[in-house]
C-alpha cells in the first residue's frame, strides 16, 4: 500500500496521501489464501491519515530516470517525463517514456479518485501496436513496464480497505520513525494490489514514508522499498530517489531505482492534457 503512495508521489508527481502518489507503490513471505484477521489501531490509522493529508505540492512536472537491474547485475535505463494535476480532491497524472527507442512514446494515464470505494482509472498506450489498453482491476497487480512496481502502486490506496497496527518507534537514518503494519481487510484487495501485507516506516518530523516492506500475495517474494534521497523542493518534502528490491528468500531477483530531477511545482497544466487522446499523441 505504501509503495503505491510513494511511487505515485514520485512517479506521477503527486501524492496527497501516503506513501501518488504517488509511488505510489508505492510494498514480505506470509502467503495467505484468506483474509488476515487484524485489529485496527486508531493511533496507527491516524498517523497514516496524516501521511495521506500532508502537503505534497500542486501541479507538478518532473523527469524520471528508471534503472532496472536483473539478478545478474545487467542494467537497463529508461527515461520518462511525468505530469500531474490536482482536480479537486482527485489527481490526474500522465507519464511519457522518452527512451530507449523500443518504449519511446509509450504513455500511462491515471485518474486517481479520492472517493472511497471508487475504482481508479488507468490507461496504457503502446505505440508499437497503436493501441491503448485500459488496465482492469484484476491486472493492477502486474508489473509496470518491467519494473518492481505494480500498476496498483501508481494510485492512492483507500485507507478503508486496510487495518493498521503501530508496531514500535525506532530510529532510521538519524530520524525517529513509526513502524506500522498494514493488512488488507479482504482477499479481494490482496488480489488486486498483489500484496498480502505491508510494513512501513514513517518519519515523525514530516510524515513521509521512507521505508517499506511488501509481502507479495501468494508468493515467497518480498519487495523492499527505501527512499534514498529526500529533499525539500519549493518547500515540499520530495522523494528524489527510491530503490525497490524484490527478493525471494535472501536472493535478489530484481531491482528498480527511480531517480527524479527537474522537479517543478505549481505549473500551469490544462486538464486537456490528461485525456486518452493526448496520451496517444506521445511526448
Stretch-by-stretch model annotation:
Residues 1-16:
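N-terminal secretory signal peptides that target proteins for export/translocation
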Residues 18-33:
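Bacterial N-terminal signal peptides
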Residues 33, 37-39:
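Boundary at the C-terminal end of the N-terminal hydrophobic targeting segment
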Residues 42-128, 165:
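N-terminal mature ectodomain segment of secretory-pathway/periplasmic proteins
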Residues 45, 76-77, 154-167, 219-224:
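A short, amphipathic edge element
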Residues 89, 173-176:
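Short acidic/glycine-enriched loop/turn segments that link adjacent beta-strands
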Residues 98, 109, 121-125, 133-135, ...:
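Gly/Pro-enriched, hydrophobic low-complexity segments
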Residues 282-283:
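Short, solvent-exposed mixed-charge patches
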Amino acid at each position: 500500500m505504501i509503495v503505491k503512495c510513494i511511487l505515485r508521489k514520485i512517479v506521477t508527481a503527486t501524492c496527497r496521501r501516503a506513501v501518488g502518489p504517488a509511488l505510489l507503490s508505492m510494498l514480505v513471505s506470509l502467503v495467505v489464501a484468506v483474509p488476515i484477521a487484524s485489529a485496527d489501531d486508531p493511533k496507527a490509522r491516524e498517523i497514516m491519515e496524516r501521511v495521506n493529508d500532508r502537503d505534497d505540492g500542486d501541479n507538478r512536472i518532473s523527469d524520471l530516470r528508471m534503472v532496472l537491474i536483473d539478478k545478474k547485475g545487467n542494467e537497463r535505463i529508461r527515461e520518462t517525463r511525468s505530469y500531474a494535476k490536482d482536480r479537486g480532491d482527485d489527481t490526474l497524472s500522465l507519464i511519457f517514456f522518452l527512451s530507449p527507442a523500443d518504449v519511446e512514446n509509450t504513455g500511462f494515464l491515471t485518474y486517481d479518485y479520492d472517493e472511497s470505494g471508487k475504482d481508479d482509472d488507468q490507461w496504457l498506450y503502446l505505440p508499437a501496436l497503436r493501441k491503448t489498453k485500459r488496465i482492469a482491476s484484476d491486472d493492477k497487480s502486474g508489473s509496470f513496464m518491467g519494473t518492481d512496481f505494480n500498476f496498483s502502486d501508481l494510485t492512492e490506496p483507500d485507507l478503508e480497505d486496510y487495518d493498521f497496527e503501530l508496531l514500535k518507534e525506532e530510529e532510521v537514518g538519524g530520524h525517529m520513525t513509526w513502524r506500522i503494519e498494514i493488512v488488507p481487510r479482504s482477499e479481494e484487495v490482496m488480489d488486486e494490489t498483489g500484496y498480502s501485507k505491508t510494513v512501513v516506516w514513517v518519519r515523525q518530523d514530516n510524515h513521509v514514508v521512507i521505508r517499506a516492506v511488501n509481502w507479495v500475495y501468494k508468493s515467497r517474494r518480498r519487495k523492499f522499498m527505501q527512499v534514498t534521497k529526500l529533499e525539500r523542493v519549493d518547500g515540499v518534502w520530495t522523494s528524489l530517489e527510491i530503490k525497490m528490491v524484490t527478493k525471494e528468500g535472501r536472493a535478489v531477483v530484481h531491482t528498480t531505482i527511480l531517480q527524479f530531477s527537474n522537479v517543478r511545482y505549481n505549473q500551469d497544466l490544462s486538464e486537456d492534457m490528461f485525456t486518452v487522446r493526448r496520451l496517444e499523441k506521445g511526448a
